[in-house]
Design a protein with these regions (language model features):
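A detector for small-residue-rich transmembrane helices and their helix-helix packing motifs
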Residues: 1-181
Length: 181
C-alpha cells in the first residue's frame, strides 16, 4: 500500500511549523520588511539567526534538510522531537556565544547547524554503536560546504554537530535510566 504523503502536516507538525516559519522569515527579508541580519553575539540575535536565510539556495538546502527530518520526528514522536529541536537551538546558541568570547567568530545564519545537530543525534542515539562512516560523511560535508561557499559558517555547522553529540548522549543516558526502572 502506498504511503499517504499529503498527511505530512498532521504526522510532523514540528517540521511543518519550522518549514513555514523559515519561509515567512525569508519572505520578510525578500520583501525588505526586515532589513538587517542580526550578527551581534547576544542571546536573542544568535537565537534569531537560526531562522534567517538571505540566499535562495541556502533556503532550499535547509528546507530540504527540514523535510528529511520528518522521519526523525515520526520515529521520536512530536513531543520528543520538539524537545530535541529546542535543546539544539538553545545549546547551539549558548555554544556560539561562549565560543565568540574565546575567539571572534563570524556571523552565522541559517538552520543548517540545527540540521547537523539532528543528523548527528540520529546517528548516535539510534543504535548501540556509532556509525563512524556517516559521522565522517557529516564532517566531510561540513568541510566541503566551507570550501565551495566562502560564506558558509564552519563554526555554526561544527557547533551543531557538537550539540547533536551532547543531545544524543543525554538522550541515551535518560533511556538507560528509564530502562532500569
Amino acid at each position: 500500500m502506498k504511503e499517504d504523503k499529503t498527511n505530512i502536516l498532521k504526522k510532523c507538525p514540528i517540521c511543518s511549523f519550522i518549514f513555514v516559519l523559515i519561509i515567512i522569515v525569508f519572505s520578510m527579508y525578500f520583501t525588505s520588511a526586515l532589513k538587517t541580519v542580526p550578527c551581534e553575539k547576544d542571546m536573542i540575535s544568535v537565537l534569531y539567526s537560526n531562522f534567517i536565510h538571505t540566499d535562495f539556495y541556502h533556503l532550499l538546502a535547509n528546507l530540504f534538510g527540514i523535510y528529511s527530518l520528518t522521519n526523525v520526528e515520526m520515529r521520536l514522536g512530536s513531543k520528543k522531537f520538539l524537545t530535541l529541536i529546542l535543546f539544539l537551538i538553545f545549546f547551539t546558541t549558548l555554544l556560539e556565544i561562549l565560543l565568540n568570547k574565546i575567539i571572534k567568530t563570524p556571523c552565522s545564519i541559517g538552520f543548517s547547524g540545527i540540521l547537523y545537530g539532528v543528523f548527528t543525534f540520529e546517528i548516535i542515539s539510534k543504535d548501540k554503536y556509532v556509525d563512524y562512516k556517516i559521522l565522517g560523511s557529516i564532517i566531510l560535508n561540513i568541510m566541503f560546504s566551507k570550501i565551495t561557499n566562502n560564506k558558509s559558517s564552519l563554526y555554526g555547522h561544527v557547533i551543531g554537530v557538537i550539540s547533536g553529540v551532547f543531545g544524543a548522549l543525554i538522550y541515551k543516558k535518560i533511556q538507560m535510566l528509564k530502562s532500569k526502572n
